[in-house]
């Protein structure tokens, strides 16, 4: 299941429910900040399966509390490319889990940073 919600409250309810039902899921999220009139952005893809779930809570990988102050996100239509990247990374992760694509790292958490054009893979199975 792909999880792409834009409110913390929905995510805080949905993630425990998926875990309770022992369902695998891939959660996507964006984080934006504005510094000197330039956008900084992070794209996050976090995978949780019945066999590998500890990282989600131990490392707070999926935001389940805090503010829904996303005015910056809602006011910047130009970040559609970041949404597309989140979706693309999630589909690639799904295909790796299903054995279609090779997965040499076995990561369950990936973050892309716009300012340095970096992909960081963590939480290996």
Predicted regions mapped to residue ranges:
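E1/E1-like adenylate-forming module used to activate ubiquitin-like modifiers
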Residues: 1-86, 114-125
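Short linear functional motifs in flexible/disordered or boundary regions
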Residues: 13, 102-103
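Oxidoreductase and adenylate-handling cofactor-binding alpha/beta cores
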Residues: 88-102
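Intrinsically disordered, low-complexity Ser/Thr-enriched
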Residues: 104-117
